[in-house]
Amino acid sequence: MASLLARRSFSALRARHLAFSGQGLQGSHLCGLQSRAISYGSNKDDEEAEQLAKEISKDWSTVFERSMNTLFLTEMVRGLSLTLKYFFDPKVTINYPFEKGPLSPRFRGEHALRRYPTGEERCIACKLCEAVCPAQAITIEAEEREDGSRRTTRYDIDMTKCIYCGFCQEACPVDAIVEGPNFEFATETHEELLYDKEKLLENGDRWETEIAENLRSESLYR
């Protein structure tokens, strides 16, 4: 009986000792965590303070720079210097429409039907231009004359369909249909861009000098 009581008392003392030692370890662990948290918080506060100081210095430098620009009108002076630079540079533009730049002899502009120097129409109504036109903008009707030659009774071009490819001019065996040098033929209505034979012949008579010169200069390459 005495041995049993001794064992129980020893077990109780051992358990109490373990309990006290566990509380001590737990307390030391908590103290370590608290110290780490305090050190982490202090480091974070230091970083935020340093970042705030940098932003404040940057803001002050920006304010100072803007104040100096406003005081000395640096932006205005910079803009005026650019204006003066281009003011004294040589002109690279022309005063259109009072001045017009050069056109290439191969320029493809408004269509025209040409005549021979005798006044006879060049077109022989072969309809090659009508056949080769990719936009199907040309409509031709013809009949045979008393002398056996064929001439057109109708020659229409829908300028709203034309893509100015120049195939009609290349296909013509007698240089009757050409694309002249005129590029100023804007209209207000659609009907004005539906050219008939009379309109095309009128264009040819008007631009014959320029057209003949362009064809002559390009004759070696055709």
From Swiss-Prot:
GO CC, alphabetical = membrane; mitochondrion; nucleus
Q: Where does this protein hold [4Fe-4S] cluster 1?
A: C123, C126, C129, C172
Tell me where it resides.
Mitochondrion
Domain 4Fe-4S ferredoxin-type: start-end pairs = 114-143, 153-182
The protein's matches in Gene3D superfamilies, at most eight in alphabetical order, are given as: 3.30.70.3270
Q: From the UniProt record, which GO molecular function terms apply?
A: 4 iron, 4 sulfur cluster binding; metal ion binding; NADH dehydrogenase (ubiquinone) activity
**Which keywords, in A-to-Z order, does the entry hold?**
4Fe-4S, Electron transport, Iron, Iron-sulfur, Metal-binding, Mitochondrion, NAD, Oxidoreductase, Repeat, Respiratory chain, Transit peptide, Translocase, Transport, Ubiquinone
Annotated residues that bind [4Fe-4S] cluster 2 are located at C133, C162, C165, C168
* Reactions that this protein is recorded to catalyse: a ubiquinone + NADH + 5 H(+)(in) = a ubiquinol + NAD(+) + 4 H(+)(out)
> What Pfam families does this protein map onto?
Fer4_7
Q: Does the keyword Plastid apply?
A: no
- Cite the cofactor comment: Binds 2 [4Fe-4S] clusters per subunit.
Question: Entry's InterPro entries?
Answer: 4Fe4S_Fe-S-bd, 4Fe4S_Fe_S_CS, NADH_quinone_OxRdtase_chainI
Give the Enzyme Commission number.
7.1.1.2
> Could you say which cofactors this protein requires?
[4Fe-4S] cluster
Among PANTHER family, the record links this protein to: NADH DEHYDROGENASE [UBIQUINONE] IRON-SULFUR PROTEIN 8, MITOCHONDRIAL, NADH DEHYDROGENASE UBIQUINONE IRON-SULFUR PROTEIN 8, MITOCHONDRIAL
Family per similarity comment: Belongs to the complex I 23 kDa subunit family.
Q: What does this protein do?
A: Core subunit of the mitochondrial membrane respiratory chain NADH dehydrogenase (Complex I) that is believed to belong to the minimal assembly required for catalysis. Complex I functions in the transfer of electrons from NADH to the respiratory chain. The immediate electron acceptor for the enzyme is believed to be ubiquinone. May donate electrons to ubiquinone.
NCBIfam families referenced in this protein's UniProt entry, alphabetically:
NuoI, PRK05888.1-4, PRK05888.1-5
Oligomeric form and interacting partners = Complex I is composed of at least 49 different subunits. This is a component of the iron-sulfur (IP) fragment of the enzyme.
Protein known as: NADH dehydrogenase [ubiquinone] iron-sulfur protein 8-B, mitochondrial
